[in-house]
Amino acid sequence: MTAPSPLGPGPLGPVGERVPDVERIAVLRANALGDFIFILPALEAVRAAYPAAEIMLLGAPWHAKFWRDRPGPVDRVLVVPPAPGIRVPDPGEPESSLADFLAAARAERFDLALQLHGGGANSNPIVAGLGARVTAGLRAEDAPPLDRWLRYVYYQHEVIRYLEAVALVGAAATTITPALDPTDTDRAEARAVLGPAERPRVALHPGATDSRRRWPAERFAAVARALAGDGYEVLVTGTPVEQEVVDEVVAAAGVPVRPQVGTLGLGALAACYADCALVVSNDSGPLHLAGAVGAPTVGIYWIGNMINGATPLRGRHRPIASWTTHCPVCGVDCTPGIYPHRPGDGDCPHRDSFVTDVPVVEVVEAARELLAG
């Protein structure tokens, strides 16, 4: 790590000196929903350390839409163009130049720029190109340095990782729990779609971006049957690309459940989960969103992802781990590298689920325990 002498110990370790006279702060984090939820405590720490500064998120188009007129630690969003290792273009998104973006961003005259987007091989050059007085963040072995940096080590809880990163600039942790409050507009949109609840609601989210994180649809259907039998109204949520797996859960459940595919915007989904007695989900953005809005959760994790992403709290949450360490198809050991193998890495091209060993009974027992209070 390279940084000035620390001011003193914080709740998670040393806290560096604050940067003087900071009016504008850039924060690079341009990936998906769950990834963003993980940095909310870091953003709250930055807000507490620099209460008068404007915090600008360098993010994706969905960030700009979500944070428009929404209270929280983000004042403004600058949309970063698609770039290798940063983000892929949205469907139909017009081409844009990273060089033009950086030129426009430099006109903001940032005092402080924070890299909270992975190890920095692709993101540190962008942060360095903003022209801020001070840059800080994470650095993997193949990444260029920033003014203040902390070594990026893959297996670390994401919330703690980014809290340690912002501590480099004097932003001590104020919480380790991501929190997000649905707005009145969010709640009204959710009510318009879902109507009033006649029974307590639970939500199941059977999708996940990576197929290796998906618990089988028939297992979710078994959970739906159990909870519907206990008297709960069961919602099955999904994005439009998850229509097939939602349909599989609904068809296999054998009891009335309510599919919600693409009917709820992100804010309305947050409000929906906030009003649920429980959310059961694969390791996914919606799982982390549910936890952030205060819903009790049962999360199904591959063990490597559990290290990085599962909440450490158990009062309202039950992460359940799959201990699979070898590809279920070819048997390749997936522990030497990072999660578990990227597509095409090494000798294993397979995308089969790594969480099929999680039993239905364990998920149902965890759900019932949380629902019992």
Give the location of each predicted region:
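Catalytic machinery of carbohydrate-active enzymes
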Residues: M1-G373
